[in-house]
């Protein structure tokens, strides 16, 4: 997840927290087409649908880490705005999910209200594939930086999709062509913030964002504070079965989404959710739901 600057500001990850050991793959090895790394990545897609990519060892990976840190800076600036200002950019669910979702607008698995601010930035708006919309001032001021993040994140995900092409018997580039940057899609950069819980609140049992699977082809997630949990495939949706994903400096989490599962059948039905921790601000810069654009 981003560079060490943000990890240095975060509380230590609790030693007694139940975690899940996801595999970590070298982005440099995937770029070079290392067959062993590719085979293990394909196996992780089938078993978990989640894995970590170490971006340290690649020039392109380090560029993306820098971009992700810029998105974290934007996240802080954005969610420092007052509530009345943020509400001016509210999304229009379910018709249009672009824009701001205030904390407490959704119900979580336990019937309580969510504890997560969320802002979806539409890729087509940023890249000029459709008429520009008016976003919150910090987003408008950082359009060039968001565009860089989108392009570099897309290139990173393309390396993963080409690896999957190889193991699915497809021509290289087949899966990437379903999500071209120059055509309209529902791809988003999603910024999230879960404020600190009130003192004395039952934080471990508090669900910040309910369990779900992602709707697109792939998601690239950057996190610093360990609120993300995964429910392994086949286990009952009970609190004790969920496992935290420990954030790792310099790594990004990849999630295989529902669309790619439908097209390829490669993933077990693993869910994710976000749970709060005491005294922490959970900030995520999340690229893409990469959606089928309808391109031939």
Where are the model-predicted features located?
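Peripheral, non-catalytic segments flanking oxidoreductase cores
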Residues: 1-296
């Amino acid at each position: 997840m981003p560079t060490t600057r943000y990890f240095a500001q975060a509380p230590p990850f609790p030693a007694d927290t139940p975690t899940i050991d996801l595999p970590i793959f070298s982005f440099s090895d995937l770029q070079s087409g290392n067959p062993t790394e590719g085979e293990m990545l394909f196996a992780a897609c089938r078993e978990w649908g989640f894995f970590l990519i170490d971006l340290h060892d690649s020039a392109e990976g380090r560029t993306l880490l820098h971009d992700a840190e810029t998105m974290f800076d934007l996240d802080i600036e954005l969610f420092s705005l007052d509530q009345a200002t943020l509400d001016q950019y509210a999304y229009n669910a379910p018709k249009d999910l672009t824009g701001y979702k205030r904390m407490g607008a959704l119900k979580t698995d336990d019937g309580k209200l969510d504890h997560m601010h969320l802002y979806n930035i539409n890729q087509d708006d940023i890249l000029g594939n459709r008429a520009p919309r008016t976003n919150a001032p910090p987003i408008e001021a950082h359009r060039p930086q968001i565009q860089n993040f989108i392009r570099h994140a897309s290139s990173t995900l393309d390396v993963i999709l080409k690896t999957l092409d190889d193991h699915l018997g497809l021509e290289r580039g087949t899966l990437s062509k379903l999500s071209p940057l120059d055509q309209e899609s529902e791809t988003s950069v999603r910024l999230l913030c879960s404020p600190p819980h009130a003192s004395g609140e039952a934080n471990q049992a508090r669900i910040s964002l309910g369990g779900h699977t992602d709707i697109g082809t792939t998601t690239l997630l950057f996190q610093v504070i360990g609120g993300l949990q995964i429910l392994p495939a086949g286990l009952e949706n009970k609190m004790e079965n969920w496992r935290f994903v420990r954030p790792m400096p310099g790594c990004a989490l990849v999630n295989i989404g529902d669309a790619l599962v439908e097209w390829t059948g490669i993933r077990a039905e693993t869910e994710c959710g976000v749970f709060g921790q005491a005294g922490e601000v959970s900030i995520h810069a999340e690229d893409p739901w990469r959606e089928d654009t309808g391109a031939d």
